[in-house]
Amino acid sequence: MLSSNQRKLISQLDKKKHRLEKNLFVAEGKKVVSELINSDWPFKNLFSTEENFHPDVELLTLADMKKITNFKTPSQALGVFFLPKSKKILSEPITIAIDGISDPGNLGTVIRLCDWFGISELICSKNTVDCFNSKVIQASMGSIARVSCHYVSDLGATLTEMQKPIYGATLDGDSIYSNKLPNKASYVFGSESHGISKTLLTKLEGKLSIPQFREGDNKVDSLNVANATAIFLSELFRGLKIKNG
């Protein structure tokens, strides 16, 4: 049975301030919660409408799940997990950096894309949405268990210290299809509405873009960052596969 204290805690964890204070976050959905459990992520509570979900599960009715869900339709499982300890940035050959994304769904999808392409860390500006926001966790579909998100106060300085060329995804850059994308570099993606910050633009070795093939005046203004990241990573790793045979 769900206690009032448990319900209050889960409600509080919807805000970043309380997540940091209590060192906890909430994950919803059977797949997402299972991914975290299978990665040995430490948890405080596990709730489910299914008795056989996990040996330590607290069985709840659908009515109780509705009281604690952040979504319109309650899921079969919800977990309260501990925030991870800070990790050192590894600076792998390919670094993906995010500048000022505020949409949780977009960030969660980017995390999932990084996981798909074998990228184990993501560097984020301090004004990017918190990766432990429950909607980010949901959109990542469990990939948050395998991709570390690092939040830095000065994204430009952090990327410069890695001593790799920095490229930015912009609307006015060179086509990714007419240039060989470097296999040791940092790639920066900004928000659809604001793009990459002016300060960070000065740090770029070059600008890259996805050409639009629709002709005429009635064109799409831009792609959202998740779509753009998917296309960039696909082209980048296609080039790496060709190079490596």
For each feature predicted by the language model, list its residue ranges.
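Short acidic-hydrophobic, aromatic-tinged amphipathic segments that line or gate anion-handling sites
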Residues: M1, A27, E58-T61, R146-L155, ...
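Boundary-proximal intrinsically disordered activation/regulatory segments immediately upstream
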Residues: M1-T49, T128-D130
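RNA substrate-binding interface of SAM-dependent RNA methyltransferases
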Residues: N38, K88-D172
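Glycine/small-residue-rich loop that forms an oxyanion/phosphate-binding "nest" at active or ligand-binding sites
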Residues: E58-F82
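Structured adenosyl-cofactor binding patch, chiefly the S-adenosyl-L-methionine
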Residues: G79, D115-F117, C131-A145, T202-G245
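Active-site/ligand-binding-proximal alpha/beta "capping" segment
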Residues: G168-K219
